[in-house]
């Protein structure tokens, strides 16, 4: 499969910046899954989708729980799996419309059918937004820790996964208390997460 050269979100962020950032012509920091530290692989699974290697794109129990929570409380809970987030980031825009959600479900089914779990995780780690103008784990590792994602430690990986719900706000230093708490929770979960890379 061909690696995605860019994503819709990269172009949206470029427009939002008033064209001040460089044109998002390519994801030039792409790194194969075999060269990505298992620590960051485990961390994003622990933080975002612990059933990633089990489900077929949708975590129906999480979706049901999110719907009930959103109806009965003021909290807005999401239930997007890594597969759903990958489909959204590669093919779609970031709005919360029903049309986008419908298309996201369609593309999730497609990538689960045509791509292996390893390929989905590889694409996710290379396209996900990790800060203002920062896309993919390699660029994030170089920006925040000044080294390759290949040697990310468990602590660094847990921090990177902890900021994913809101990377443009939560990556500001000093690290907010709720991000630190989330980082510790992810770090505690790492020994129980297995990645299946062929």
Language-model segment annotations:
Residues 1-198:
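Juxtamembrane regions of bacterial inner-membrane/periplasmic proteins
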